Structure formats: structure tokens, C-alpha cells
Amino acid sequence: MSDVTAIKQLVEKQKQLKSEIAKIIIGQEQIVDEIILSIFSGGHALLIGVPGLAKTLMVNTISQALGLDFKRIQFTPDLMPSDILGSEVLDENRNFKFIKGPVFANIILADEINRTPPKTQSALLESMQEKAVTVAGVRYKLELPFFVLATQNPIEQEGTYPLPEAQLDRFMFAVKLNYPSFSEEVQVVKQTTTDTEVTVNPLFNAQEIIDYQHLIRRIPVVDNVIEYAVSLVNKTRPKTEMATDFINNYLDWGAGPRASQNLILAAKTHAAFHGKFSPDIEDVKAVANGILRHRIIKNYKAEAERITEDDIIKTIL
């Protein structure tokens, strides 16, 4: 199949995927879009939202519709790296046998990742970067495609271990989850308080998703779009030649080169989903918020004046 035909097919399948997910998840289109963009771009996503907004249900539904294996890990202060990666046990012949942990799935929901100490966080983050884990000196490759969706509760900060900036940078998207609108919540209550069973049909399989990820990487990008993405990222860096006074006043730290790479990858996926054979500047703008918001560090002045990351990104766009 030619790449042109494959992109046309992807447009149709992506529309079907969204309508399949909408059978169970009401509203939240932007969030679902960003998660799907992240999966097809080969990245990971961080979901920031208060409890009770159907994060687990959303990820479970998306994994069913994609035909992928799904595991949920609840992060707690006493969780150990072996609880995620797996461990070696003695079998009946007194030989060591490796028992795989929950990380050996296609889609991992790392629930409340900031509740566990850095030692355990880094075990998951290594697997995100390397797509492999090392246990007792032996390296095990993970099943592909591999996608981590980590959640964080922005309200409770007691007893949490905030993710360091270097680890946050490994997430392609930071997705902000808001409360549903009044009409959406009415629909949610109607749907969840009856005895009807809704089934989600798988539309893809693991190999198809890997093929689409390769297809997206093959999409060509013109130089001016790459230069625009890199200039956007450069504008977030205070005290550099491209930084405006607004950035110098309100930011301590800007985004690194990984942000530029992710902007282009996500823009390619966004373009493919809309039937375009090459991304333009509008595609970069469409994905900029989700890719930059967790990579810029505000200073005390911005906190005091209640300026959000999205406000800052709006000024550079």
C-alpha cells in the first residue's frame, strides 16, 4: 500500500476510533485527541486532573478500541521497582525464573505517579525512554507499541514526590483534564445509572499501530515549518536572543530540544489525521499547548499574578 493510500485510510480509521470511544466517554474530545496523537506519534502522555474524571475508564476504552493490552499501576509510597518491572523467583528446579511485571503491556496507566518515591518513578521512566527494562543485569525488551499514560492530581501536594523536570520532559504531551460541562455531566449520569452494556469494538491491532507510527515518521516536513517549531521553543527560553520581555519577566526556565522534536512529530500526526501529506504551521500551533505546558517553569512573579502556562504559550504563538 502506498503512503498516500495509507494516510487516507488512517483518516477514516481515526474518525471511527473517536466515535467508538465516544460510546463510553462523553465529551472530553480535546483530551482524547491529544492521547491518540501521542500514541500514534510514539510518545507518552501526562494527564493532570482532579480525581473522579474517568481517567482510568478513558484509557481502558482507548486501549480496547486500539486492540491493545492494558495494565493499570496504582502508585503508592511503598511501591517498589520490582512491583512494576517484575522480579526473579526460584522455580522448583532451583533455577531463577523471571516473572514479568505489569510494565509488559502495550498501554500502562501509571495512576498518581507523584505518590511514589523517585527510585520507583525512575524505574518506569527508564522503560519509557529505552522501551526495555533491566532486571538483575539482564535486559528485557518491552512489547511494542508501548505507551505510558501517567496521572497527577494537581490539588493534593502532601505526601507527594513531584516529578523532576528531566523526567517530565520524557512525556510528549501534558493533557489538562477539566470538569465536564453541565450537559455532558447530565449525559454521563444518564448513561452510567442504567443497566445497559456498551461494547467497544477493536479497530486496530498492535502491528497496524506500529506501521502507522512508521508511516507518520516518513511524512516530509518543509524547512520553514521546522524553523517555526524551533523558534517557538527558543522563545520560551528566558535571557536568550528570541525571548520577549514577557518571557524574561515570568519564566525561570524554557523548553529543551526534545520539545522541538515532539512538536514536529505531533504536527505530522495531526496533519495525517486531517488528510494532509505534510504538516504546516497551523498543525504545529494545534499541538503546541500540550507539548510545551509541562516544559516551561514559571517564576514566583508568574505564580503571584496567577499567570498560567497556557497564558505564556498564547503570547509566543
Labelled PLM ranges:
Residues 97-106, 135-152, 163-172:
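AAA+/SF3 P-loop NTPase mechanochemical coupling elements
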Residues 68, 161-178, 196-199:
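A short helix-turn-beta junction within AAA+ P-loop NTPase domains corresponding to the substrate/partner-engaging
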Residues 8-53:
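Pre-Walker A (pre-P-loop) alpha-helix and adjacent loop at the N terminus of AAA/AAA+ ATPase modules
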